[in-house]
Swiss-Prot record:
Encoding gene per record: Stxbp5
Localization (cell): Cytoplasm; Cell membrane; Membrane
Major place of residence: cytoplasm
A GO biological-process term: protein transport
Protein origin, superkingdom: Eukaryota
Modified residues (Phosphoserine): S693, S724, S760, S783, S786, S901, S903, S1059, S1132
GO cellular component: acetylcholine-gated channel complex; cytosol; extrinsic component of neuronal dense core vesicle membrane; hippocampal mossy fiber to CA3 synapse; presynapse; secretory granule
Name of one Pfam family that matches: Lgl_C
Region (Disordered): 14-35, 555-596, 675-731, 883-907
Annotated protein name in UniProt: Syntaxin-binding protein 5
Tissues of expression: Detected in heart, spleen, lung, skeletal muscle, liver and kidney (at protein level). Detected in brain, particularly in the olfactory bulb and in hippocampus. Detected in the tenia tecta and in the piriform layer of the brain cortex.
PANTHER family (UniProt xref): LETHAL 2 GIANT LARVAE PROTEIN, SYNTAXIN-BINDING PROTEIN 5
Amino acid sequence: MRKFNIRKVLDGLTAGSSSASQQQQQQQHPPGNREPEIQETLQSEHFQLCKTVRHGFPYQPSALAFDPVQKILAVGTQTGALRLFGRPGVECYCQHDSGAAVIQLQFLINEGALVSALADDTLHLWNLRQKRPAVLHSLKFCRERVTFCHLPFQSKWLYVGTERGNIHIVNVESFTLSGYVIMWNKAIELSSKAHPGPVVHISDNPMDEGKLLIGFESGTVVLWDLKSKKADYRYTYDEAIHSVAWHHEGKQFICSHSDGTLTIWNVRSPAKPVQTITPHGKQLKDGKKPEPCKPILKVELKTTRSGEPFIILSGGLSYDTVGRRPCLTVMHGKSTAVLEMDYSIVDFLTLCETPYPNDFQEPYAVVVLLEKDLVLIDLAQNGYPIFENPYPLSIHESPVTCCEYFADCPVDLIPALYSVGARQKRQGYSKKEWPINGGNWGLGAQSYPEIIITGHADGSVKFWDASAITLQVLYKLKTSKVFEKSRNKDDRQNTDIVDEDPYAIQIISWCPESRMLCIAGVSAHVIIYRFSKQEVLTEVIPMLEVRLLYEINDVDTPEGEQPPPLSTPVGSSNPQPIPPQSHPSTSSSSSDGLRDNVPCLKVKNSPLKQSPGYQTELVIQLVWVGGEPPQQITSLALNSSYGLVVFGNCNGIAMVDYLQKAVLLNLSTIELYGSNDPYRREPRSPRKSRQPSGAGLCDITEGTVVPEDRCKSPTSGSSSPHNSDDEQKVNNFIEKVKTQSRKFSKMVANDLAKMSRKLSLPTDLKPDLDVKDNSFSRSRSSSVTSIDKESRETISALHFCETLTRKADSSPSPCLWVGTTVGTAFVITLNLPPGPEQRLLQPVIVSPSGTILRLKGAILRMAFLDATGCLMSPAYEPWKEHNVAEEKDEKEKLKKRRPVSVSPSSSQEISENQYAVICSEKQAKVMSLPTQSCAYKQNITETSFVLRGDIVALSNSVCLACFCANGHIMTFSLPSLRPLLDVYYLPLTNMRIARTFCFANNGQALYLVSPTEIQRLTYSQETCENLQEMLGELFTPVETPEAPNRGFFKGLFGGGAQSLDREELFGESSSGKASRSLAQHIPGPGGIEGVKGAASGVVGELARARLALDERGQKLSDLEERTAAMMSSADSFSKHAHEMMLKYKDKKWYQF
């Protein structure tokens, strides 16, 4: 029977509707204007959404475990997440459905299983023998709270301590409770009426499995005999207990207490401890007890054959060490090493050579789980150096403020970045290899290079190799190195927009082919970087200062006497070119003492040594104007072929030629409209005209005379007489407004900076991103007033390309497309010098084209298709080393520039069209060029808004991918905008997701799922099918090490380890059944059926088909064997029956 496919039905419906709409459009247009039919290859079956991998440090860690045979590390978190680490490149992420905090983890050593205890009193058994671990069993305690668990090595019985002081025993194979229970009132002294507190420790004697050591929080320790069901010894101490550890010989144990002391006890001497140690306490001269210290939260005792044992502990510092960082103390013989940590210690484990507790442990390393880091300390080398961590756990080293994802990069890019990044690695690491090396890598078919770039709050930019679902840091760039550090708070307040993180990265623009990098920072600064493998010494850092503010000047100000610069109407049929002009850049203050012409950050004026990697090409800063700080940059684009960078904010747009170090364009948003402004807006402030900006700043000029009325304001001098008192009142009012405006501007900037920092905090959407008042609700109302539109119109999208700009154009030309938050798209044409020799000698002419397109909602992304529907990538300059000794002359360098145009338009016929794909918060449009008619239109969402939209390549075609605020991920075919995928994935819960979600080619996407973790996902069916093969394996068959030899005399005199038949002791036959109301067993999806259900897509179907086929084949084989046996038996029976018949056929009845 043929399988019914609902997707093909939907494709037929959508294709039918799209064809109907196309027919309607064709009826509306004459035959000569019909759009050529483009064959689209993408269908619904090419898309499927699934998570792939999660990278980064586990957010809010709470538990730690290690399998010493499999060499696998497990970390649990407060959000119920489970992260497993093997060799570098082998990682796994799991999530408990309840989301409760993980309080403890226990490996079934070398069994491929893990037990997790959660704060909701549930135990889970995880199966690690599959690439995606799943829960086999769960056990929910109903009447008691779980506080501690202990699973002896090579045992299937799990001891579970509770808050009431009782201990229950669970069979880990069936996850059922045993009837054997250790009650707290039987464990303590019968004469004692006080409750000993929750169970904080359980462990069996290394030499006698029948003796169980139980530690209660109040300070009581009990050695329980499992066979006789009574307490052998009871040890009491005045201070509360936090942890207990055995000596491997089973004759002594050590306890850590809340007063910072360690007590060592002999098993057979319960009266008092053999020794009391206060590691960090001051020893008093008169022999009195040392002063109490902070609690020792955990202690471990590990022995060696060749020397003194190691005592390792966390906490216990003296109370007078105020401000001291958390420490891990390693005591070995007479030496004590205090190792300071950067963050609070959550847990630690000592890695030993043997898994057997009754043998010399021979510790070789300590794993320290910190609040925001994972540290591995080498115990075998002097000074206890740390191992170099190969996992990508430093994503959050500084809070992530933005990120970009690039798939299918040039193949030589990752080796180039790795080579320059390898020089940045610090020294002093342990010389040994990383000891956590379990598991095996996956065998994925995905081979194209992938790079992730993250921008951080401290101004750093990190490049990551993300190929084949792994992550490895390649290179780190510190953008703050070009700026002077503010020495005192007063200087910082004079210029900074924000009080903290003035170097935070907001936008990243990167050209992988040319390796040019451009970043925009929170202090309204832009830095352009060029990649070089040579070290250079920059004598003077090139810089430009730009005044990006549109205001009209008063006549009575000194600056007002100069003729103001004029703007060209955008809608003019003959737009005038914009010649470059040069103006001196001087920092000054206005006549009323307001800060003016001063950037927020100060560039270093001393020579700067730039290491191989990304080196500063140009620094651009927006300056203060009339006491008001510059607005933060909202959009950024760079083109290496043109040598241009453009950026915009809520005031306007500026274009810079970074080859000539000149400003080509400086327009306000209103000036982009010219006479075509549909809102008839006037400049927002009638006080100041725009002053000449930094070196190389250009203003638009036109040949007509400017009316004088345009230069005047209501408060300027005019023919009407004004009373001096009225003027004074007006001036006072203006000063108050300016003061309040400055305060408000800085307050808003601080709020934006704090919002960027909140990417590192688990904030909820409701207090910080209100549904009705947030930065993403710019265009959700169709009835926005002109004042509201004016206050909200910001440059939101920029794109360089060679397109058919005007309706009369017959050949494409370089241009810049500009999108704003009110849904308007402008086109600015670029007239480049004819050859590379003239590039530095002649200016780039910039002029508005007059083309204006409108959409509903803020424009997010723009791209272009050729007549065949292929994506037209912007032109670029191939990378070439610039810092070569024989090429010091700038003109010689420029002659060797070979810009490459990857646009297919050069090979097109003149009559062929292009398509402009424009995506806004609400809708997407495909405009036919040069006619500028709407070929296709799709309303993406009515009730929500698009957060991120990207035009991406997939399966030799292109599509539009969108992520909406309501959690839907959608894809549309191009150019017809036919819906292909619409899946509810993730609701917008905080600004972190909104700021970091991005799509990449080949069906890849990512976002910052927590302040420390990146979640990658795919919307490609092919990747989903191959994902199972790409994932690494956690469990590998390894032989368990041999048990330690007991020795002749120990075996003869009974000095060796005593075994215990736990099955006989805890089984149902001897201990009975546990109460059903005590705990509830919940079967998990991770068994044989769970393994079948865990697989997804075609791989899962094939796996199930193979499994069913194997089972059917096995059954058929068994049936065949049974049938053959029955046939053989039948033949034998027939033969014997025939012989009997021949024997007795001639005999009479009386002869028998």
